[in-house]
């Protein structure tokens, strides 16, 4: 099969790559649409992914084979599913989303009740998941958002409860990122907080408020942190959806002055990455790693993350809970820009993400 692999420090389309073998609980899909994520280029640039390993984490397609211990009552050949794959992993280098065939764990696979087709458009606005292009945008961002709210911040999976689950606001820095847009929708539907405060470009304000954001601060403003602190000095729940050294400093400064606060990071940044003079005893940094949901330890660069059964349980429960909400249109995919040359467009997609061409949208390649 064709696949996009890491070769000499680059993403390269290669032919004659073996189709991945199926482990227990996995299904094989004919991959029909894929989406890029920052972690894809990071696996190359930071030498996390092994040479020859298949890249890609977001895939949508049609089941062509059931692996061992897959109940045919739950998944059948011909079903349309979309799911997260740890592409270019040390443990399973022969499996990734950017390939003609991919293996997906049924534990965290989203299943469509209907056939998913190609829309054929160059640009896809946010909306219900009714197409392969839309489905490909979902797995990484929505599953990550679900983990942040349940595993890290302790929300219950209750749909539209009458009172907020937490007596305080949440701050989402990077509200227009893929994870940010998913978090806004979920925080709104789970009624998790008294307010949803987002930091994003003003151009995304209309969409983010439609999702449920209460107030937007523009990160372009030099005094954005001061603006936030002036209006809200009690933020105990904060998520850094951009997740770099600079945004960590800014998010950390927005945390409540006195009461305990948690900043959730999506990378390996810790308190050690916060400038010494800004560190505070009342602020804790927690992390969500989607790679931990596989149920096994994860070698990652020079670190090995231990198996995390609780993260796996949380992800499993979340996918089961949210799947029907996606199917009936209550959760939307984010905007997408579609590339029409299949796997051959993937290296370009990764470069476009790296240089920031994906503002407020996912970049999707269709394999038709």
Curated annotation (Swiss-Prot):
Gene3D superfamilies: Medium-chain alcohol dehydrogenases, catalytic domain (3.90.180.10), NAD(P)-binding Rossmann-like Domain (3.40.50.720). One of its GO terms (biological process) is cellular response to acidic pH. It comes from Saccharomyces cerevisiae (strain ATCC 204508 / S288c) (Baker's yeast). One of its GO terms (molecular function) is oxidoreductase activity, acting on NAD(P)H. This is Uncharacterized protein YCR102C. Pfam families: ADH_N, ADH_zinc_N. The lineage of its organism: Eukaryota, Fungi, Dikarya, Ascomycota, Saccharomycotina. Belongs to the YCR102c/YLR460c/YNL134c family.
């Amino acid at each position: 099969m064709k696949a996009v692999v890491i070769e000499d420090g680059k993403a390269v389309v290669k032919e004659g790559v073996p189709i991945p073998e199926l482990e227990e609980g996995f299904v094989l899909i004919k991959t029909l649409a894929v989406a890029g994520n920052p972690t894809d280029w990071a696996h190359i640039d930071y030498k996390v992914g092994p040479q020859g390993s298949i890249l890609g984490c977001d895939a949508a397609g049609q089941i062509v084979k059931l692996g061992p211990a897959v109940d045919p009552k739950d998944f059948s050949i011909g079903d349309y599913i979309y799911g997260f794959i740890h592409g270019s992993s040390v443990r399973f280098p022969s499996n990734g989303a950017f390939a003609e065939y991919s293996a997906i764990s049924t534990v965290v696979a989203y299943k469509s009740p209907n056939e998913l087709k190609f829309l054929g458009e160059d640009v896809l606005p946010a909306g219900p998941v009714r197409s392969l292009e839309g489905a490909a945008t979902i797995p990484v961002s929505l599953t990550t958002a679900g983990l942040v709210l349940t595993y890290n911040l302790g929300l219950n999976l209750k749909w539209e409860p009458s009172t907020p689950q937490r007596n305080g606001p949440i701050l989402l820095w990077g509200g227009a990122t893929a994870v940010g847009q998913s978090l806004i929708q979920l925080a709104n539907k789970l009624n998790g907080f008294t307010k949803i405060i987002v930091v994003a470009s003003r151009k995304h304000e209309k969409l983010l408020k439609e999702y449920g954001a209460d107030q937007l601060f523009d990160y372009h403003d030099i005094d954005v942190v001061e603006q936030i602190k002036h209006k809200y000095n009690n933020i105990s729940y904060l998520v850094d959806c951009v997740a770099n050294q600079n945004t960590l400093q800014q998010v950390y400064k927005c945390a409540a002055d006195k009461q305990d606060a948690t900043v959730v990071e999506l990378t390996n940044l810790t308190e050690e990455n916060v400038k010494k003079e800004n560190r505070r005893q009342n602020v804790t940094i927690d992390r969500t790693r989607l790679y931990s949901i596989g149920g096994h330890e994860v070698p990652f660069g020079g670190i090995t993350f231990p198996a995390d059964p609780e993260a796996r349980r949380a992800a499993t429960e979340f996918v089961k809970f949210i799947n029907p909400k996606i199917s009936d249109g209550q959760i939307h995919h984010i905007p997408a820009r579609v590339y029409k040359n299949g796997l051959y467009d993937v290296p370009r997609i990764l470069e476009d993400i790296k240089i920031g061409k994906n503002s407020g949208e996912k970049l999707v390649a269709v394999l038709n």
